[in-house]
């Protein structure tokens, strides 16, 4: 980017997290345009260069065909929850989730537990209630039929839940650089658009209590309403237009 700047080549960067990383902060002094996923990020960059565009993942998931909970043997009589800790899964969370799963017995909701491909075999000894299905991975299209998701809070996940106005319980990974996931989730929680349960506080009592709270009508509707503030369904198109403005020297 710096070399391109010296050569007179137009440059644009996109910051996916709510609190920018060191690289983009440094590059912001050299590039022509800065696109951000969170309104809160604008304060960290030169005002004249910065535009709030959201994350292109929003547009991608909205264009997907809707997955059906029936594919997992679930119905529409009860709420449908997805519990996922990333595509690979998490060793720490696997231990906690194995203890949690039997507690879903007799609950009036259905739970799809996505283990991640690295830890699926670890669940073979778990006594699984009839309202729980355990799978190694899933397609994000099933988020479109979910009532609640319990998940990490990486930039792509934030883009997905905000695009779908999907209430969530975020469990930020404490192992990422600069604690980005917690900061992403906190941006939503501060606007009452999600719930946060830190990994160190994760236990079946805390999670079950949060699930019950999320399904209270007034809480659920408030989260969906507040998620609209973060939703950018035309993100990719907006970024494309900014790129073309640079190409045409219209900035």
For each of these PLM feature ranges, what is it?
Residues 144-159, 166-167:
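Acidic donor-binding loop of glycosyltransferase active sites
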Residues 219-233:
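A short, well-ordered alpha-helix in the C-terminal region of glycosyltransferases
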Residues 5-66:
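Active-site-proximal region of nucleotide-activated glycan assembly enzymes
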Residues 9-10, 147-148, 165-173, 193:
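Structural loop-to-beta junction motif characteristic of Rossmann-like glycosyltransferase folds
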Residues 66-67, 74-149, 182-185, 190, ...:
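Donor-nucleotide binding loops and adjacent catalytic segments primarily
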